[in-house]
């Protein structure tokens, strides 16, 4: 069973320095049909203008993954972490008992395009933490690359939840498959380009909630970048 979340039905807004689209209810945008899916709570697609950014703000009890599609994003937090997130990097911040951070576009000429993902943790009160790893394009080209998991398998960043996040880059006509255990669920997000998901056409920004499907076949209709979540 698949339920499509069309890109043009997402919430969001344009604030000059920030253009954002919300797959699920977030801040002032609320849709009772789209409050999240399983442990997946937020997928925000953001475009941050040159020299724009989010000032220091708090989070609690959330696993936050930032995935940059183009440009670069500067991160600073109350743990003393300072880093720049580049395209293809996987960054995980465990908010746990509480963390404060800021995010900014350090470029004076180029916007940064990113996905920010929130996953509910397996329990409250985790120790706050930060992890960032690079996942080269070659490792994602034509195949799924695991970038986040509960046990840090295959060099992925570690999250406090029974969930996995895969990414693939596909050329037009290229196809990948992924199998799921009967009790698992999946969410697919088209970050760039277009694909056919088990024959269903999806475009950039579209998502799909998937249950009771043992196998997914994703075929690119154009150059595409796709995120796939395996969820309990």
Language-model-derived ranges and their functions:
Residues 1-232:
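Jelly-roll (double-stranded beta-helix
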């Amino acid at each position: 069973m698949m339920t499509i979340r069309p890109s043009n039905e997402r919430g969001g807004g344009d604030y000059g320095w920030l253009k954002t689209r919300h797959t699920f209810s977030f801040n002032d945008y609320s849709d009772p049909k789209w409050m999240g899916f399983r442990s997946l709570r937020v997928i925000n697609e953001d475009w941050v203008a040159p020299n724009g950014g989010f000032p220091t703000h708090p989070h609690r009890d959330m696993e936050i993954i930032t995935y940059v599609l183009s440009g670069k994003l500067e991160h600073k937090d109350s743990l003393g972490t300072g880093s720049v997130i580049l395209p293809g990097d996987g960054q995980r911040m465990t908010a746990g008992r509480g963390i404060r951070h800021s995010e900014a576009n350090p470029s004076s000429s180029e916007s940064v395009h990113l996905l920010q993902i929130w996953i509910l943790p397996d329990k409250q009160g985790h120790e706050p933490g930060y992890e960032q790893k690079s996942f080269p394009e070659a490792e994602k080209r034509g195949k799924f690359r695991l970038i986040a998991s509960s046990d840090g398998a295959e060099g992925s960043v570690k999250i406090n939840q029974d969930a996995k996040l895969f990414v693939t880059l596909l050329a037009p006509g290229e196809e990948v498959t992924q199998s799921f255990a009967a009790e698992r669920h999946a969410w697919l997000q088209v970050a760039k380009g277009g694909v056919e998901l088990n024959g269903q056409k999806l475009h950039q920004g579209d998502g799909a909630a998937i249950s009771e499907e043992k196998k997914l076949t994703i075929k690119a209709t154009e150059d595409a970048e796709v995120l796939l979540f395996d969820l309990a």
